[in-house]
UniProtKB/Swiss-Prot annotation:
The keyword Protein biosynthesis does not apply. It comes from Erwinia tasmaniensis (strain DSM 17950 / CFBP 7177 / CIP 109463 / NCPPB 4357 / Et1/99). It holds the Pfam family KH_dom-like. The keyword DNA repair does not apply. The lineage of its organism: Bacteria, Pseudomonadati, Pseudomonadota, Gammaproteobacteria, Enterobacterales. This is GTPase Der. CDD domains: EngA1, EngA2.
């Protein structure tokens, strides 16, 4: 599972500033996710290839009434669902009673906690943080989040070693009891994602790996009904009330000779409507299920249309690089006029998702469900397809011939060669001169050209650009013996002319 890091502290100590610093390292989705109270934000971040989910919480006001009664509920939940806590204090304001109360609560929870003193810019850090040693939380890590000072050290010297040593151990569902099976599955996944050696890849076929399919969406859109329809049994509790599913449920299954692991998730609800503690915990599990899946099936209610919550969830899926199938449920019973209106709205709001298949189904009655797995397998096969360097380079040159790269600083951008940089999602790495200066419009053109040429559907494509290093940069040009003789003759000639 992806580790979860919570930022906790009093109001205005710089939690959101640090949150933006952390999530910006990977252009993560930084937004107030639906299903969460106003003071909690979730984002994705990365340290040297190690991904984690970061939670920004609202300020905690631990006054004379006690931290247990005054601590904001969303901050309490963030502490509980986190694997590690970054407790932030204000070095300029000094130690406050609320800091002491929060530290006491954190010690009682026995969570791994690192004390971070923010706003140390312009101060003698050692003197400014001396009072915070009384909190009894160990070493203090001074930073200036607004300027980025100390943030890299915090990541590399604190969080990264912790992530390397402590793998979050979470409760497994009944279907995950066979540890050997899951260990073997993880080893195979490493090969799918391009982490295997060349010898291992030669005898590995992605078709041997079960496809992990996550079914996600807002509450009461019919996710569990769809799961039961696919399985042909009442495997998941279904009741006409939002929030029936409380956790992500992993269900192995087989269809048409191919193995799948179905992940039925809890719904991501509109903020302000999440009241029960257990339901709030399920949101983070949904996000982790998306990270863990190969293909994500986003279920939308045809009666309600696509909402802002659907778009926010869609944004997280795209940032995760997961393959996508869009399912519009409860299609039965709608008049043709209403169906046309729904399709028109989908075209308008999902115009930027041109690679995902859209299915209109009725999970309750089963209409259209049988066609879903064609799109699921298509998306997975496209995301794990191996393409050699020669083919990618040929496609790149064809794209450049059809539409030349633009001029950058009066020089034509030169595309040299392309190769695969990873799978699931497919990554194409293009090498050349000034390629990083290409405008976004031409980058989109290349991405769409690769998609059409490789006939890729159901999965996003990522293109990375690399420029070759100049081998002579910073080096003095050494003259050949012949050039040295010519230089001596020229210097002698110039001296004679001066006389």
């Amino acid at each position: 599972m992806v580790p979860v890091v919570a930022l906790v502290g009093r109001p205005n100590v710089g939690k959101s500033t640090l949150f933006n610093r952390l999530t910006r390292t990977r252009d993560a989705l930084v937004a107030d996710f639906p299903g969460l109270t106003r003071d909690r934000k979730y984002g994705r971040a990365e340290i040297e290839g190690r991904e984690f989910i970061c939670i920004d919480t609202g300020g905690i006001d631990g006054n004379e009434e006690g931290v247990e009664t005054r601590m904001a509920e969303q901050s309490l939940l963030a502490i509980e669902e986190a694997d590690v806590v970054l407790f932030m204090v204000d070095a300029r304001a000094g130690l406050m009673p609320a800091d002491t109360a929060i530290a006491k609560h954190l010690r009682s929870r026995q969570k791994p906690t690192f004390l971070v003193a923010n706003k140390t810019d312009g101060l003698d850090a050692d003197s400014a943080v001396v009072d915070f040693w009384s909190l009894g939380l160990g070493e203090i890590h001074p930073i200036a989040a607004s300027h980025g000072r100390g943030v890299t050290s915090l990541l590399e010297l604190v969080l990264l070693p912790w992530m390397d040593e402590v793998v979050p151990q979470r409760e497994l569902t009944e279907e995950e009891e066979n540890a050997a099976y899951w260990a073997e599955l993880a080893a195979k996944e490493a090969k799918v994602n391009g982490e295997a050696t060349a010898d291992e890849e030669d005898d590995f076929n992605p078709l041997d790996l079960p496809i992990k399919l996550a079914i996600v969406g807002r509450p009461n859109v019919g996710k569990s009904t769809l799961t039961n329809r696919i399985l042909g049994e009442d495997r998941v509790v279904v009741f006409d009330m939002p929030g029936t599913t409380r956790d992500s449920i992993y269900i192995p299954m087989e269809r048409d000779g191919r193995e799948y692991i179905l992940i039925d998730t809890a719904g991501v609800r509109k903020r302000g409507k999440v009241t029960e503690t257990v339901e709030k915990f399920s949101v983070i599990k949904t996000l982790q299920a998306i990270e863990d899946a190969n293909v994500v099936m986003l279920v939308i209610d045809a009666h309600e249309g696509i909402s802002d919550q659907d778009l926010s969830l869609l944004g997280f899926i795209l940032n995760s690089g997961r393959s996508l199938v869009i399912v519009v449920n409860k299609w039965d019973g709608l008049s043709q006029e209403v169906r046309d209106e729904v399709k028109e709205a989908l075209d308008y709001r999902l115009g930027f998702i041109d690679f995902a298949r859209i299915h209109f189904i009725s999970a309750l009655h089963g209409s259209g469900v049988g066609n879903l797995f064609e799109s699921v397998t298509e998306a997975y096969d496209c995301s794990t397809r191996r393409v050699n360097t020669s083919m990618l380079t040929r496609i790149m040159h064809m794209a450049a011939d059809d539409h030349q790269p633009p001029l950058v600083r009066s020089r034509r951008v030169k595309l040299k060669y392309a190769h695969a940089g990873g799978y699931n999602p497919p990554i194409v790495v293009i090498h050349g001169n000034q390629v990083k200066d290409l405008p976004d419009s031409y980058k989109r053109y290349l991405m769409n050209y690769f998609r059409r040429s490789l006939d890729i559907m159901g999965t996003p494509i990522r293109i990375q650009f690399k420029e070759g290093d100049n081998p002579y940069e910073g080096k003095r040009n050494l003259l050949t013996p012949n050039q040295q003789r010519k230089r001596q003759r020229l210097m002698s000639h110039l001296k004679k002319n001066k006389r």
